[in-house]
């Protein structure tokens, strides 16, 4: 196998072989466009609009009331008419304890939770895009392997045909060579279909017309080990911090609600005799201490629950990061070993066996076995690279690698 063929395969493993896919796409571009095309942004904006409207209502004082009352209406002559009373009162409830600010604080905390949740949802979109991108890269690399296999099978079929014509090999050798060529072409068709299907799924996620995308050039076989210090994604911690602020705001609201509100009222009273009086009143409800303590205790328990959930989540995420990093390292070693040792050896073996076969030193079966060994080595290399990049997808999600791409501009 010429060394240039191996170099071309490794340098362009991500390149699409079909001219139908005309628009190159990098992973960063794919993530940016998928997030922009997702209706998740409109849904999150609607949720925020709802909460902003709720906040406006929460930041208002209680509604004033106006009451009109007529008393002593009846039948009894002028003496009774002089006892008619018409009273108009204006009533206002005076909130105490900072209830208004506490209500607004709860809604502000809800808004923070929604924003943190929105960022997590956008990061999940990025993860879905990255997973599809890896699938498309693997499919493109498989196409390259299949194309190389077809090229080798064609050369071998011609060589065997010449030997059969010269009566140096039996007829079945030519039949077997043609069968292997047909099998290689079928595998190429299947690989191209899988590649096109992966790109179609990518186009659907991006909201693009199918048939206009191709994965940008890169090296699918380049692998790297994770860095030593990896921490959970800040966005995953941020939502717990937002929930913590929400629990603290709810506690302040319940503490403020423990103070009863003062209600004042006043107004004129018109008497049937022609006299005018002024009425005024003050109302102060008695505290329900048991209910207040219960509400405060519930809010405190919710705050403790958020802290406990955060501790559990961080514990689990650190374990998941360690496992994902180990998988990335393990698969990177496998890719490097197969790429740098197994595949070159299989290429040299096939080249040497073919040279010996042309000199009459080997049989067609020897060449066929060497060809199969090379194909299996390359396929194993692509499978290992696929597992490596899939493990990288999980690790990137846990560490929030693409947060900067999915954040909304401020």
Locate each region found by the language model.
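Hydrophobic helical h-region of N-terminal Sec-dependent signal peptides
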Residues: 9-14
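N-terminal signal peptide c-region/cleavage motif recognized by signal peptidases
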Residues: 17-18
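Bacterial Sec-pathway N-terminal export signals of envelope proteins
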Residues: 21-70, 93-95, 102, 168-171, ...
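Short, charged, amphipathic alpha-helical segments
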Residues: 104-108, 171-180, 364-372
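Small/polar-residue-enriched beta-strand and adjacent coil segments characteristic
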Residues: 24-26, 64-121, 238, 243-314, ...
């Amino acid at each position: 196998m010429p060394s240039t063929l191996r170099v071309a395969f490794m340098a362009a493993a991500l390149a699409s072989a079909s001219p139908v896919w005309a628009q190159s796409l990098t992973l960063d571009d794919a993530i940016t466009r998928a997030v922009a095309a997702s209706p998740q942004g409109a849904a999150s904006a609607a949720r925020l609009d709802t909460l902003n409207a709720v906040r406006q209502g929460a930041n208002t004082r209680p509604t004033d009331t106006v009451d009109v009352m007529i008393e002593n209406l009846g039948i009894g002559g002028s003496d009774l008419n002089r006892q008619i009373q018409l009273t108009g009162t204006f009533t206002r409830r005076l909130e105490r304890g900072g209830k208004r600010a506490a209500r607004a604080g709860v809604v502000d905390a809800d808004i923070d939770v929604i924003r943190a949740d929105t960022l997590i949802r956008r990061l999940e979109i990025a993860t879905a895009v990255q997973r599809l991108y890896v699938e498309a890269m693997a499919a493109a690399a498989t196409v390259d392997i299949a194309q190389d296999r077809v090229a080798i099978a064609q050369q071998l079929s011609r060589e065997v045909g010449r030997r059969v014509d010269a009566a140096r090999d039996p007829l079945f050798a030519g039949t077997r060579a043609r069968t292997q060529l047909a099998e290689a072409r079928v595998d190429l068709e299947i690989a191209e279909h899988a590649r096109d299907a992966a790109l179609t799924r990518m186009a659907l996620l991006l909201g693009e017309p199918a048939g206009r995308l191709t994965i940008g050039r890169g090296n699918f076989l380049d692998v790297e080990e994770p860095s030593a210090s990896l921490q959970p994604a800040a966005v995953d911690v941020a939502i717990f911090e937002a929930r913590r602020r929400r629990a603290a705001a709810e506690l302040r609201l319940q503490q403020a609600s423990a103070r009863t509100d003062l209600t004042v009222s006043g107004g004129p009273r018109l008497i049937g005799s022609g006299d005018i009086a002024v009425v005024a009143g003050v109302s102060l409800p008695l505290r329900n201490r048991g209910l207040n303590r219960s509400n405060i205790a519930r809010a405190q328990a919710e705050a403790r629950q958020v802290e406990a959930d955060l501790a559990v989540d961080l514990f689990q995420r650190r374990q998941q990061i360690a496992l994902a990093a180990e998988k990335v390292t393990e698969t990177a070693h496998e890719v490097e070993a197969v790429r740098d040792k197994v595949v070159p050896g299989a290429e040299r073996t096939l080249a040497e066996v073919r040279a010996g076969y042309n000199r009459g030193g080997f049989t067609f079966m020897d060449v066929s076995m060497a060809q199969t060994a090379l194909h299996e080595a390359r396929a194993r290399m692509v499978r290992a690279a696929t597992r490596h990049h899939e493990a990288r997808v999980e690790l990137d999600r846990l560490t929030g690698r693409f947060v900067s791409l999915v954040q909304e501009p401020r």
